Amino acid sequence: MVTLKLKFLKALYNFYDEYAQNFSSVCTPGCATCCTHNVLITTLEGVHILFYLENRGKLRLLEKLHSTNYLRPRVTPNQLAHYCIHKIEPPEDDSFIISPCPFLTNGKCPIYEVRPFNCRSLFSEKKCHLGGEAFIHPLLLTVNMIFTQLLEQLDNSGLYGNMLDVLSFLANEENLAVYMKGKTPNHTPGLLPNKPLPGFLCPPEHQLEVEKILKEISHIEREGKNINQCIKLVY
């Protein structure tokens, strides 16, 4: 089942990459202002990265993944959606600092081809170093949240957290074996169990576009199976 989910993950990545081309971006190779150690991913995305490194004989890159005071989320995207839908104040994340991503090599990403959604969805219409932050179109921000929620649901038996924690967890052969069997891994410090999709966080002005996107995604098939068998696409 994990193998099939990996194919759906790649399909969602490809769909998003093509959709995002409708928005302007000033990002170029070597522009790494937003490449920090505060990247949040699912275990499914972590497995995608791990297999990529293994297939290319680059597992040694995992030895670089050491950092401190990085972001460890208190809630998953779908938990956040649940809080917002029910008008509950979500818990605040603990304090963290901004430091470069340990993967960065001479300002470039050695896993760019399989970079997680948190990375591929962060690009700016203006140079980040000028204002200190990325400028993203409001519609794309909504679409980014929708995809983040879908990816969490796709990895329904997995975990969510900082990429450093997720990859460290999966680098343990026993943990990886449990996950690949489709079982929910034991609780691990810094990682949160993925939650069901409670509804999408979408402002009224973006609803029609989101419905259109979800309809197109609903046609994705791999190995004779429809993506609807893994994720809920009803708005």
Where are these regions (language model features)?
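Short loop/turn segments that flank or connect secondary-structure elements
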Residues: 1-235
